[in-house]
């Protein structure tokens, strides 16, 4: 954490960066919903609930192509997901924030429990219908 804080100071962005440390879910969501983007720079963690939570509150994602979520982030334009992102990608998310936020708000239903149950029931209906033929 200290190394990142020093880097933020060196880059002159410290006033615009918040290092929160560990937070409860209730503490996180209000901050996440006001954020320009959720930045996830991972090389191995491939299934992150924080990405789903960010999309659910309309916060665009900037991540590597490692998380499983990266596929639908790219497909539905919920943010940037690529091997190496940089300042131009961050500028893109900020400059086009309305589009990314709107896309997140439209997509979040697909991540809901209700949608997952409906998908399961549809698959089961199709299976039963195929058995009748």
Where are these regions (language model features)?
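Short hydrophobic beta-strand element within catalytic cores of glycosyltransferases
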Residues: 60-63
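Aromatic "clamp/platform" in nucleotide-sugar-dependent glycosyltransferases that forms part
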Residues: 43-44
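Nucleotide-activated donor-binding/catalytic signature segment of Leloir-type glycosyltransferases, i.e.
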Residues: 3-22
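A charged, aromatic-enriched C-terminal amphipathic alpha-helix characteristic of glycosyltransferases
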Residues: 98-131
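Short alpha-helical segment that forms part of, or immediately flanks, the ligand-binding pocket
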Residues: 29, 51-56, 70-71
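A short hydrophobic beta-strand element within the catalytic core of glycosyltransferases
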Residues: 39-40
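Short alpha-helical donor nucleotide-sugar binding micro-motif in glycosyltransferases
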Residues: 22-23, 30-35
């Amino acid at each position: 954490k200290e190394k990142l804080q020093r880097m933020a100071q060196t880059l002159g962005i410290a006033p615009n960066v918040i290092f929160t440390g560990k937070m409860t879910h209730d503490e996180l969501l209000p901050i996440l919903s006001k954020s320009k983007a959720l930045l996830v720079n991972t090389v191995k963690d491939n299934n992150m609930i924080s990405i789903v939570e960010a999309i659910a509150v309309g916060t665009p994602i900037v991540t590597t192509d490692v998380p499983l979520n990266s596929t639908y982030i790219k497909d539905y334009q919920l943010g940037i997901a690529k091997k190496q992102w940089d300042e131009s990608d961050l500028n893109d998310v900020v400059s086009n924030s309305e589009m990314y936020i709107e896309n997140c708000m439209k997509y979040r239903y697909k991540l809901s429990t209700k949608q997952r149950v409906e998908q399961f029931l549809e698959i089961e209906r199709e299976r039963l219908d195929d058995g009748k033929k």
